Each structure stands twice: as structure tokens, then as C-alpha cells.
A protein has these predicted regions:
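Acyl-donor-binding surface of acyltransferase catalytic domains
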Residues: 1-7, 79-173, 309-315
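Conserved acetyl-CoA-binding loop-helix of GNAT-fold acetyltransferases
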Residues: 99-116, 254, 260-273, 277, ...
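Conserved active-site tyrosine of GNAT-family acetyltransferases
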Residues: 140-144, 299, 304
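Hydrophobic beta-strand residues of extracellular immunoglobulin-like
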Residues: 61-64, 224-227, 269
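Short amphipathic alpha-helix that is part of the acyltransferase structural core
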Residues: 2-50, 169-204, 324-326
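C-terminal "cap" of GNAT-fold acetyltransferases
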Residues: 4, 156-177, 281-293, 302-326
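Conserved hydrophobic beta-strand within the GNAT/NAT acetyltransferase core sheet
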Residues: 89, 129-131, 249, 283-287
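A conserved beta-strand-loop-helix scaffold within acyl/acetyltransferase catalytic domains
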Residues: 35-56, 76-84, 199-254
Length: 326
């Protein structure tokens, strides 16, 4: 890696350490607050959990920029999403320190890390890096354009304020059953992979990966999960949780044989009703605005509005054969 940065002498770049969990989480909250949407921030507990995922090491895959007195004002992490060929970067710059080369320095270091890691990819695979900016963050979007990134997608965070628990009706033959981790986890994992294979940027996860991300996260509550069954088959699911002070529809999916019957909307309304009964009247979710399965339509029909927009960028690091679910 190069030691060259775009920083002035009052700022320094270094690898992250485990001691940085709380200050990095504080930085992320500050940035999201300035962008007007703290629901997409994180807690120290969730950040630490993410850092413990297999294949990620904050001391090699995450970087911070700090002031001379040790205050962290910039953060970037790089994740190997699939096969050392699809990488994603996630970064934050304190609003008082924008325009000082922090974002460019961090993205440059993330790219260098990706270039080193891609040596483990199959030699004919296309290698690319994804990153995103808040739709209101013109500085960040200009930085990505300057670094050679192209806009490839838009994502929305949608939200609804509930004034009552909506009614819902499941399609004939479909019923909810409580989620039993021992009996149902493998089946929900398989249904999750199947339901999202057509989604942009998606790929199958292993059961270990899925369990870590879904069942072992700090705020996991099995009583919030809605699993729709048709006999012995899972037809759809809504993996709900509480997130940063609101109800969150984390992953809502319907398997292809059960699509077009209103199950997606029923799952959404059932999720709203459950949150409302628990005293939570604000519910949000994230969705690909260009989703080919029409995922945004039931959300809009249910009365959800766009609360935030995020611009997804891509940079090709090496041409080649596309990944199976790219």
C-alpha cells in the first residue's frame, strides 16, 4: 500500500483497532444525523458484531482518519461480498471536515485493499467495487465521479407513520407459524436465498453467514419474525426487528410460486400491525428503487413514503466473467 494521502498535516490515516468501535459508531451517527436520517446509523454493539463476521478484520479491512488529538473524523470499511471479486466499501466523513481530502484518502486506501485481496479471486472473474452516497451528499457523489465510479443503482429507505394497526388477509391456504430456530432456521435460510436470487447484487449465502447476520445480531427477536407457510412449504417471510428507535422490516420476501397472490402486501401489513401492537408507530425498510420483482409497489400501496435516497456507485477493477448472481 502507498503512504500517499490527500490529507493536510493536521490529519492522519491509520488502520482501525477494536478500541475504535465506540468512536466510529459515534461518527456514523453524527454523519447520518447531518444527512437527516439517523435510522440508518448503527450502535456500537451492532458495529462490533459486524466487525466479527468471518473474513473481515477491522485491523486490515477498516481505516480511520483522525485529528492530531486523536478524534476520529473519517471511517471506511471494505467487505469481500463474494469470491474476492465483488467488494463493497462503506465510509463516513464528519460534516465539519468535508472537503479536506478525507473521503478520497479513505476510498483510495479501500481500493488498494481490494486490489490486494482480488489476487485470491479466480483469474477470469470480473472484479468490481460498490459504494454508496446519500442522495443529498453532493460532495460524496462528486468524489466518486472523480475517482472513476459510475452510478449503477438507487436505493430508498421508505417509512410509514401508523395511526392504527392495519387489517390484513393472508391468501387462501397460507398461515403464520411462530419461528422456531431449531426447526425452521434452515428452511428460512433456503427460502431467503431463493426469494432474492433475482435481486440486483444478490448471491446465495451459506447457512453460517446467514445465521451470523440474521440470528446472532444483537437485536434479533424471533417473536418479530413472520413466517408464512403453505402446508410444509415456506411461502414468504418478513424478518422484522427494531432498529435505531423504529420498527424495521429487515428482509421481506416471497418465493416465486406464491407471488402475485397478495402475500407480500399481507406480510407488510401484518408487520405493521405487529409493530403497532408493540407500541411502535414508525416503521421503515430499505429497497432497491429499480427492483425487477416490483418490490417497491406494495410498499407504496401500503402508504409508505420515500424518507431517504442513496446512490450506489460501481468501479470495475478488472474485466472478466460475471459472477453468477451479479
Amino acid at each position: 500500500m502507498t503512504d500517499k494521502t490527500h490529507l493536510d498535516s493536521s490529519l492522519g490515516l491509520r488502520a482501525a483497532t477494536w478500541a475504535d468501535v465506540h468512536p466510529v459508531a459515534d461518527l456514523i451517527y453524527t454523519v447520518c444525523e447531518a444527512d437527516g436520517d439517523v435510522t440508518v446509523a448503527t450502535t456500537p454493539e451492532n458495529l462490533e458484531h459486524a466487525w466479527r463476521e468471518d473474513g473481515f478484520d477491522p485491523e486490515t479491512d477498516a481505516f480511520v482518519v483522525q485529528t492530531a488529538d486523536g478524534r476520529i473524523v473519517g471511517y471506511e470499511e471494505l467487505a469481500n461480498e463474494q469470491a474476492f471479486a465483488h467488494f463493497s466499501a462503506d465510509g463516513y466523513v464528519h460534516p465539519d471536515f468535508k472537503g479536506r481530502g478525507i473521503g478520497t484518502t479513505l476510498m483510495t486506501r479501500a481500493e488498494e485493499r481490494a486490489l490486494a485481496m482480488m489476487k485470491q479471486a479466480e483469474p477470469d472473474l470480473r472484479v468490481y467495487l460498490h459504494a454508496a452516497a446519500d442522495g443529498k451528499d453532493e460532495t460524496g457523489q462528486e468524489m466518486f465521479a472523480h475517482l472513476g465510479y459510475q452510478i449503477v443503482r438507487y436505493f430508498w429507505r421508505m417509512e410509514i407513520q401508523l395511526d392504527s394497526a392495519p387489517a390484513f388477509a393472508l391468501p387462501t391456504g397460507i398461515e403464520f407459524r411462530p419461528f422456531d430456530r431449531d426447526a425452521h432456521a434452515q428452511l428460512v435460510w433456503q427460502a431467503d436465498n431463493e426469494a432474492f436470487r433475482e435481486h440486483w447484487g444478490s448471491h446465495d449465502t451459506t447457512f453460517k453467514e446467514w445465521s451470523f447476520r440474521k440470528l446472532e445480531r444483537p437485536e434479533f427477536d424471533p417473536s418479530l419474525w413472520l413466517i408464512a407457510w403453505d402446508g410444509s412449504e415456506i411461502a414468504g417471510f418478513s424478518q422484522n426487528r427494531f432498529r435505531m428507535g423504529i420498527g424495521w422490516v429487515g428482509t421481506l420476501g416471497v418465493r416465486k410460486p406464491w407471488r402475485g397472490r397478495g402475500l407480500g402486501l399481507a406480510l407488510l401489513h401484518a408487520s405493521f400491525a405487529d409493530f403497532y401492537r408493540r407500541g411502535m408507530k414508525t416503521v421503515g425498510l430499505g429497497v432497491d428503487a429499480s427492483n425487477t420483482t416490483g418490490a417497491t409497489r406494495p410498499y407504496q400501496r401500503a402508504g409508505m413514503r420515500i424518507a431517504s435516497e442513496f446512490v450506489n456507485f460501481e468501479k470495475e477493477l478488472r474485466p472478466g466473467r460475471s459472477l453468477e448472481y451479479e
